[in-house]
A protein has these predicted regions:
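Terminal and domain-boundary accessory regions
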Residues: 1-207
Length: 207
């Protein structure tokens, strides 16, 4: 799945909103249990982080259900409440919940204990983080996609990272089978879809 050496200690950092936007744009859903199994097949996985913002009044929101499931099934979920603000330009209420700072701090904090960091995001704002990790002697892999329209993978991020993995190439490994029309009780809604009453919690920067 990834170019991880057998003796490498590595950690995974998933930008939840950006990752969701990527696999949805590619037309498939991710089986997070299967993905964790695949990640454990190579190297020495130290930790798999998942970052997401949660609506402050969303105890029963789909994204909360996903976060709880991940937390109980091998992932370390880092979350914070969204913040509502008034957009004077449009005259409407908007919701913000950016997790970039939390992800960056955790990656830097874990750097002395790993050899390789894997970032699931195409956000160009992470380019300086990747550069700093490389300066500390770590290898960096970014998982995103250039096949979405427009590409979610920022060009500056692809040029900076040591390895780039095209998410579309992983769909047969970590993709969830198509749901039947009558639903699937085992399906965990990712909670980011607007038609579920949730909001898109993060912007998707492409540079």
């Amino acid at each position: 799945m990834l170019n991880i050496k057998d003796n490498e200690r590595f950690a995974v950092f998933i930008d939840g909103s950006n990752f969701h936007s990527t696999f949805k744009s590619l037309g498939f859903d991710v089986d997070f249990a299967l993905m964790l199994e695949e990640l454990k097949k190579t190297g020495r996985l130290v930790r798999a982080y998942y970052y997401t913002a949660l609506p402050h009044d969303g105890d029963f929101a789909p994204i909360r259900r996903l976060a709880d499931w991940l937390d109980y099934n091998g992932y370390t979920v880092i979350s914070k409440q969204t913040r509502d603000f008034y957009d004077s330009a449009t005259g409407s209420k908007r919701t913000k919940g950016n997790m970039d700072m939390e992800l960056a701090l955790d990656m830097l904090k874990l750097a002395p204990h790993i050899d390789h960091a894997v970032l699931f995001s195409g956000d160009g704002d992470f380019v300086r983080l990747i550069e700093e990790m490389q300066n500390r002697g770590l290898r960096m892999t970014v998982v995103s996609s250039t096949k979405t329209k427009p590409p979610i993978m920022a060009d500056v991020l692809r040029r900076q990272t040591d390895d780039f993995v095209e998410l579309d190439d992983l769909r047969d490994l970590i993709g969830r089978p198509q749901r039947d029309d009558d639903g699937d009780d085992d399906y965990i809604d990712d909670g980011y879809d607007d038609d579920d009453g949730a909001v898109m919690l993060d912007d998707r920067r492409r540079t």
